[in-house]
Amino acid sequence: MPFPANKTKLVCTIGPASDSLQMLENIIRAGMNVARLNFSHGDFDSHKKTIANIRAASRNTGKRVAIMADLPGPKMRIGEIADEPIALTPDDSFTLTTQEIIGDANRVSVSFSQLPEAVKPGDKLFLNDGYVELEVTQVDATEVHCKVIVGGHLRSRKGLNLPGIDLGISAFTDHDHECLKFAMENGVDAVGQSFVETGADIEALRQAAEGLGHDPFIIAKIERAGARKHLTGILQAADGIMIARGDLGVEIPIEQIAVAQKNLMRQANLMGKPVITATQMLESMTTNRRPTRAEATDVANAILDGTDCVMLSGESAMGNYPLESVAMLARIAAAIEPHRAAYSVKQIFQTRWEGDHILLHDIIATSVESTLNRITPASVIVPTHSGTTARSIARFKLPVWITAVSSSEKTCQDLMFSYGIWSVHEPDHPDDWKSWSLKWLKSQEVSGDLVVLTEGPSAKHPHRNNRMEIIDLGRQVE
């Protein structure tokens, strides 16, 4: 039986705690499907070694793993701090400067050179994912003087957020282009674009990748308030989204995050685009062997709401328990998935189809979903070139695995981001998919009485009809 216990895909950020070959093999066996490299940290040499280790660990374990490069984008950060962490106390004076200095408890540098022009007295600034709040009191040519409103500890290179202030900067920076070029040259499968505002930001990234001769799977990170207003355009341009709750939770009131998360998932599910839910999912496991009850519930609710992936950040990158964190995600997912209520995408489709163009892969997807309301097959086998039909079916979050068979290795890697899809690379693209399915099921010792098979036109068989077949394994002759 090749299928794991959990259908939710696990994305793990790789860092000093997890970048060794042995640890990578361990967390792959524990359930990691996608390895995330945060290009806001580290250098190209270290990332190159990590990529090589991930590929080697994937080969050694015999398990498919996709690699995602998370581009920094125009993220504003403070600079280096001596004797960190520093402690900021309410009513303290604290200065942000565009000068390159080593920071201390009174002053730190910032990466955004236009900060003094962008803010004015009375504006609120946030550091370290909103844990530290400042109010601007005075602005000079190179310095922004502030009063500490909410204090806390601060370390080097933590983020700076300016909610509600239009900075007029592109989401795809020159440094992003350098990172993209490196990632493509080193065989990275997917790219995460930070601080996306509109679909045009994704198009700029895609055009840059095409200029380099590549077509990566592109994840739009939703972490700005403005992105929610342009979500349809972003989803049309991107291959999937990440709900990056750290920066998003600073950009919008924190009490609105839960509803925003649900709405983002619903829209992405409708459009058949995979969703990654990220930030602080098991934050306490950075230092503790077990998560809090609230964290376990957070992961569970994201799965119940329709996420395709759940993601670890510091827990797996620099925490004390990277392996235990991955195993815990897998445990929670396996326990929660059987309790997921039927997702209501079908009713949404039926509303949308009134007067609109009907897409064939939507019809196939709803037919498969309706069939699985009556039977429980061993798997749904979907031959696919681009992965579109498989993702269209996967949005229903079915109770059985979808076996997506493709002649494209890229498609197999892309499908690692989709809930409940098991990718199989079949370079020859057989003439008889029914015979292939029976042989594959037997070779993998997949148990069950029934299998659902979908077929459609292909480059080899352009006139083949779209159809769905239920195969009774008990009636097949050897």
Question: Can you say where each PLM-predicted feature lies in the sequence?
Answer:
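Non-catalytic helical/linker scaffolds that mediate oligomerization, partner binding
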Residues: 1-478
